[in-house]
């Protein structure tokens, strides 16, 4: 760690951020002033928690937004503060000044207790379609594009938590059939079903990994290196955990959402998990079955999705209930 005092380092990086926004982004003076004010307020809040602006983690930033809400800030004002935070931490990440973006999985504040965000089937298809198209594009970075396509197919096909998704072991590539065993909260195992599209994406990703591994082995052999051990993770990374950080995936998901013409704030790993559950229920799935697939230990947790059933249940009652039929006969 640098010998520079924490307060001094925070100030220097904040100054560098503002200089970048001015020189490279052409931000107006009022915009720069807003960034400076927002981040100075965040810095003061973090200081009271014994945390620095540079090293703040997701829970620290979420606590700040909660603090703003408790102070009576409108959702729009909270969203502006979050936007300033996103710009700053993306700058730190892009400059290599920290290894992650702690704002990647923070959703924009919203008023009141809202129903779970979800996506329409059309929007999900749009997202998956673009991911497949980009994965098929040859050239530099193709394996990363294939990986992104697989991540999205797995997430929508299974409804996995993002923490479960990014930490899948590489041994899942050796599993046969359409079922996948995953380990969720409390180290509880559960079985999920893979779609045909997810299986095909996994096969393409496996082929890409093998090709890269062979290239690395050849390079190591030419340099007489022997350390070519394979990562135990399906989505390896140079992160502390060794696998793809969920914040990085969340950020990349918002980027591809924008390219697909969707609103970035309306798309996140958790929203895709909600879409998985909502679309199953809309098409007649049993709530208990969805509970098992999501890995909820309590049915009450799954019941937040019952709002999607209202229209379908009304139609079922009108079509199949004996009294409803009797009423039709009397007409």
Swiss-Prot record:
Keywords in alphabetical order: Cell cycle, Cell division, Chromosome partition, Cytoplasm, DNA integration, DNA recombination, DNA-binding
Residue intervals of the Core-binding (CB) domain: 8-93
Cell division is among the record's keywords: yes
Record bears the keyword Zinc-finger: no
Major localization listed first in the record, in broad terms: cytoplasm
Gene Ontology terms: cellular component: cytoplasm
Location of the region described as Disordered in the Swiss-Prot/TrEMBL record: 214-239
Active site residues of this protein: 161, 185, 270, 273, 296, 305
Biased composition (Basic and acidic residues): 214-228
Record-level Gene Ontology MF annotations: DNA binding; tyrosine-based site-specific recombinase activity
Domain Tyr recombinase, residue spans: 114-318
InterPro entries, A to Z: CB, DNA_brk_join_enz, Integrase-like_cat_sf, Integrase_catalytic, Integrase_recombinase_N, Integrase_SAM-like_N, Recomb_XerD, Tyrosine_recombinase_XerC/XerD
Compartment list: Cytoplasm
Any one of the GO BP annotations: cell division
PANTHER family, A to Z: PHAGE INTEGRASE-RELATED (PTHR30349), TYROSINE RECOMBINASE XERD (PTHR30349:SF90)
Family to which this protein belongs: Belongs to the 'phage' integrase family. XerD subfamily.
Biological role stated in the UniProt entry: Site-specific tyrosine recombinase, which acts by catalyzing the cutting and rejoining of the recombining DNA molecules. The XerC-XerD complex is essential to convert dimers of the bacterial chromosome into monomers to permit their segregation at cell division. It also contributes to the segregational stability of plasmids.
HAMAP family attached to this UniProt entry: Recomb_XerC_XerD (MF_01808), Recomb_XerD (MF_01807)
Subunit architecture: Forms a cyclic heterotetrameric complex composed of two molecules of XerC and two molecules of XerD.
Listed name of the protein: Tyrosine recombinase XerD
Organism of origin: Agrobacterium fabrum (strain C58 / ATCC 33970)
Gene (name only): xerD
